[in-house]
Design a protein with these regions (language model features):
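ATP-dependent carboxylate-amine ligase
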Residues: 1-165
Length: 165
């Protein structure tokens, strides 16, 4: 057990997460510092479940957590069923500030408990409005979606320039 404790404190904490796979950044938007959790590299049922569970388990007040979910793509005729599987998981979390983008996630949004709903975004540029109009300084925003949704490009813009507006 001493070896495990050593690895935990000296090795694993030094591992840098790959961009888009759970890495965190502090970004500045409209004079607000936002803690961005970037899960935007891709999305599939397992990685989405893991990201939601990890975000939910953070020791942060639930009203400080914002989650933006984009579609999981390339699921073929299983798409609707696999998107619907996430409804029960989202409803079981303490996360109340939920935003979605994309056709499949918009359908999921309609089936969520009323107190989980925040808004459906129609275009990626509305993320700025989400941050400016709804978030406070030091709030947390997790973004998760498939590459083809374009969320990863937007997140890279946020992280690269540190100020979008």
């Amino acid at each position: 057990t001493n070896n495990i404790k050593f690895l935990k404190t000296h090795t694993f904490q030094k591992i840098k997460l790959v961009d888009g796979r759970g890495d965190t950044s502090k970004i500045k938007v409209d004079n607000k510092i936002i803690n961005l959790i970037d899960e935007s590299y891709n999305s599939n049922p397992l990685s989405l479940k893991s990201a939601i569970n990890n975000f939910n388990s953070l020791d942060i007040k639930s009203d400080r957590k914002y989650m933006l979910l984009g579609d999981m793509l390339e699921l073929g005729f299983h798409s609707e069923r696999l998107h619907n599987q996430v409804i029960k998981l989202i409803n079981s979390t303490s996360i109340k500030n939920l935003y979605v983008i994309g056709g499949e996630m918009s359908k999921v949004f309609k089936k969520l408990k009323y107190y989980k709903k925040s808004n459906v975004l129609n275009k990626i540029s509305q993320i700025n409005d989400l941050i400016i109009n709804n978030m406070n300084n030091n709030d947390y925003l997790m973004i998760k979606g498939s590459n083809a949704t374009g969320l990863n490009k937007y997140v890279n813009l946020l992280k690269g320039f540190k100020s979008v507006l």
